[in-house]
């Protein structure tokens, strides 16, 4: 039984629904056969990522159920020299059902969201009591038996779309919906480890948003982390409400994931940056002045002002008026209403007109 586990955490302070619409979700990923549950538990308790509610762990096991002995690599072999998927996953992925149950229990105890990607039908049955929703890997978007099995649980589904075209996405969505999936989040993904910035094609999120307005969108990121965590921030601004990123304790560890993953420093940097972005975005609301603009609104806008001294009873024309700051008098938006009106008293040049200065029409 193969399970490629994801541990996700909601960065919002409260989860009101399993629906992803109100939550910012983050996947972190790591795998190494030398890890054991006690060391992972310690990591979850003590690491900085645990403090912000993100679990830094994911494994796959039993390569024989999803990769033939003749399956070639699809990662950067200059970073991970193993050229066979079967050999790589046999070498590094070692957790089974007991370990996943223990991890799920530990996550529940520490209020960390546990979710896993099943890679075979039996894994769906094993995971179903442990998770609130399922993640389907890009590689299985064309695997109808697995899609149907996951959808039949009735739980929300995160569907990755790496290396897929629109026809394949449509087909997968049709299968999921017909088999019982009600809530689906579609993930943009480039199935290339690592993904160069010019190949990330975050603009595809715009196309996916236009094609599937009824779906929630996400982004599974395989670019190398940078100081600004640009890819994740950009995807979020383009509408991705679910973000997925590989995580490791040590980028030098062997395997096809560590060398392009984020570490604890990257994750904390991302948290800081996304907090700043959320501050910049503010709440979604109709365009209107905010409290700190009131003084500027008053003093930086213009009023109708006299260009010369005028005697009481003078009938105003274009030549008598100019728009000047501040905006404490009659607004230039009322220009046409003022033209032709008479002044009610003597007024000096540069006087800011008010309605009291004019006779009634």
Residue ranges and their predicted role:
Residues 45, 55-361:
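Catalytic cores and adjacent flexible loops of soluble metabolic enzymes
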């Amino acid at each position: 039984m193969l399970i490629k586990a994801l541990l996700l955490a909601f960065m919002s302070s409260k989860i009101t629904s399993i629906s992803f619409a109100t939550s910012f979700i983050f996947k972190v990923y790591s795998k190494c056969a030398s890890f054991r549950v006690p060391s992972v538990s310690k990591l979850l308790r003590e690491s900085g990522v645990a403090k912000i509610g993100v679990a830094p762990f994911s494994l796959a096991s039993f390569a024989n159920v999803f990769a033939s002995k003749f399956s070639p690599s699809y990662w950067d072999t200059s970073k991970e020299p193993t050229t066979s998927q079967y050999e790589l996953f046999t070498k590094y992925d070692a957790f089974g059902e007991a370990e996943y149950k223990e991890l799920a229990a530990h996550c529940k105890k520490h209020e960390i969201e546990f979710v896993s990607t099943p890679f075979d039908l039996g894994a769906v049955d094993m995971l179903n009591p442990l998770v609130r929703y399922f993640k389907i890997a890009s590689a299985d978007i064309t695997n109808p038996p697995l899609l149907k099995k996951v959808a039949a649980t009735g739980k929300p589904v995160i569907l990755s779309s790496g290396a897929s075209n629109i026809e394949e996405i449509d087909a997968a969505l049709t299968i999921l919906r017909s088999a019982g999936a009600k809530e689906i989040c579609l993930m943009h993904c480039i199935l290339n480890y690592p993904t160069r910035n010019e190949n990330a094609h975050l603009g595809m999120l715009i196309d996916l948003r236009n094609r599937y307005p009824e779906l929630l969108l996400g982004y599974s990121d395989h670019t190398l982390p940078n100081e600004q965590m640009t890819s994740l921030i950009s995807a979020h601004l383009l509408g991705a409400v679910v973000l997925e990123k590989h995580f490791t304790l040590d980028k030098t560890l062997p395997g096809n994931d560590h060398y392009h993953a984020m570490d604890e420093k990257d994750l904390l940097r991302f948290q800081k940056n996304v907090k700043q972005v959320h501050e910049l975005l503010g709440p979604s609301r109709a365009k209107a002045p905010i409290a700190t603009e009131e003084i500027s609104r008053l003093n930086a806008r213009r009023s109708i002002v006299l260009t010369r001294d005028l005697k009481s009873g003078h009938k105003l024309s274009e030549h008598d008026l100019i728009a000047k700051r501040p905006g404490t008098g009659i607004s230039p938006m009322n220009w046409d209403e003022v033209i032709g009106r008479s002044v009610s008293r003597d007024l000096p040049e540069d006087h800011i007109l008010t309605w009291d200065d004019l006779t009634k029409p």
